[in-house]
Amino acid sequence: MRPYFTLLLALAFILACTNLVEADAGRVLETTTNEHARHLRTAVASVVDLPDDEDERLLGYNTVQLWRMRRTANKLMNGKLTTQKEAALKKWMASQQDKFLAKWLKSSSVYPDQVYSKLGLTKLGASAKSSPNYQLYEKYTEALLQRWTNFKASPDTVYKSLRLDKLGAKAPQSPSYPMYEKYLQTFFRNQPAN
């Protein structure tokens, strides 16, 4: 209720201030009994105010500071600094990918389908493979498959660790199912021939 009360007070203040409108002396010819006209006052004729003067008065900046601020804003708007920021952001994201990958591989409570949804690939649907996050997901799945291959995990263990057993008949539609098929191929390829 308090925000509404504050907004109501602000609205009342604005309405009260609108009665103090400046009027040109040449346009107000007579005094009327109208309540609003009594509050009108004549505008003082002065030197033409520039918009910079208003900024200086409102913000307390001098002309040089305002000029520097405008120049920086123009550079930002033209995109010179944004390309530098984008490059820095891409570099930071690349360094963070390795950290996320190590964190996901270390944790036993993180599953591939969770990683798939955390990377926002679930929402993309069929176009997920063209996303840059899909490359990170592929790195994660390759590292996970390599780990299972090194430990010679059974296909049942991999099936359960991918939580495909909980999906039942819907397991082939899961994003983790192709990973299970890849593991089966490598598992049977590495089996000795009888």
Swiss-Prot record:
Q: What residue range is the signal peptide?
A: 1-23
- Compartment(s): Secreted; Host cell membrane
Outline the segment boundaries, as ranges, of region: Host plasma membrane-binding: 58-108
Keyword Signal belongs to the record: yes
Query: What are the alphabetically sorted keywords of the record?
Result: Host cell membrane, Host membrane, Membrane, Secreted, Signal, Virulence
Q: Record's GO cellular component, any one?
A: membrane
Per the record, the domain of life is: Eukaryota
Location of motif RxLR-dEER in this chain is: 38-57
By sequence similarity, the record places it as follows:
Belongs to the RxLR effector family.
UniProt free text on domains:
The RxLR-dEER motif acts to carry the protein into the host cell cytoplasm through binding to cell surface phosphatidylinositol-3-phosphate. The alpha 1 and alpha 2 helices (residues 58-108) are required for the localization the plasma membrane.
Question: What is the role of the protein in this entry?
Answer: Effector that suppresses plant defense responses during the early stages of pathogen infection. Suppresses cell death induced by effectors and PAMPs in plant hosts. Avh240 dimerizes and localizes at the plasma membrane to interfere with aspartic protease AP1 secretion, which presents an effective mechanism by which effector proteins suppress plant apoplastic immunity.
The protein's name: RxLR effector protein Avh240
Q: Which species is the source of this protein?
A: Phytophthora sojae (strain P6497)
